[in-house]
Regions:
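Active-site-adjacent beta-strand/loop module that shapes the phosphate/pyrophosphate-binding cleft
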Residues: 62-85, 111-122
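Conserved hydrophobic/aromatic beta-strand scaffold that supports enzyme active sites
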Residues: 4, 14, 75-77, 97
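A short coil-to-beta-strand element that immediately follows conserved catalytic motifs
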Residues: 51-60
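Nudix hydrolase/Nudix homology domain
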Residues: 21-22, 90-128
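Conserved N-terminal beta-strand and adjoining loop/helix that marks the start
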Residues: 1-12, 61
Length: 128
C-alpha cells in the first residue's frame, strides 16, 4: 500500500527511507488478516506520525510483478489527518511535504507516476 497524504496547502507527504534511495510515498506491506485500508492507515502513522481522520480513498491498484511476483500496490488518498507521533523509528531518515508540481528529482519512479496520474490527469498505468 502507498498513501498520498495531501495537506491543506496541497502538498504531498513523502518519506526518505534509511534503506532505499530517493523519496517515496509512505507505505509498506499488508499484515496477515489486515485490510489494505487498515494497512495504509497504520503505515502512515508508523512512518510519518499522521493519524487519518475518516476512511482513506482507494485511487488505484498496480501490479508490481517485475519486482515481486504476485505483488500489487494499492494507492490511497488521505486528505484529513491529525499530526501525532511516529511509531517506526530508524526506518525513515527524512519526511518532507512537496508541491506535486515541484517534486525533488530523486522521487521514486513509481511514486512520481502515481502523483502524475492523480494531479496531472495522466493515464493510470496498471504496472507500478
Amino acid at each position: 500500500v502507498r498513501a498520498v497524504a495531501v495537506d491543506a496547502r496541497g502538498r504531498v507527504l513523502m518519506v526518505r527511507h534509511t534503506y532505499l534511495k530517493g523519496w517515496w510515498l509512505p507505505g509498506g506491506g499488508v499484515d496477515r488478516s489486515e485490510t489494505t485500508h487498515a494497512a495504509v492507515v497504520r503505515e502512515l502513522r508508523e512512518e510519518a506520525g499522521l493519524v487519518a481522520r475518516g476512511a482513506p480513498r482507494l485511487i488505484s491498484i498496480h501490479s508490481n510483478e517485475r519486482f515481486f511476483p504476485g505483488d500489487h500496490v494499492a494507492v490511497f488518498r488521505i486528505d484529513a489527518f491529525d499530526v501525532g507521533e511516529r511509531t517506526s523509528h530508524g526506518e525513515i531518515a527524512e519526511i518532507g511535504w512537496f508541491s506535486p508540481s515541484a517534486l525533488p528529482d530523486d522521487v521514486n519512479r513509481g511514486c512520481r507516476a502515481r502523483l502524475a496520474e492523480i494531479f496531472d490527469g495522466s493515464p493510470i498505468d496498471p504496472d507500478w
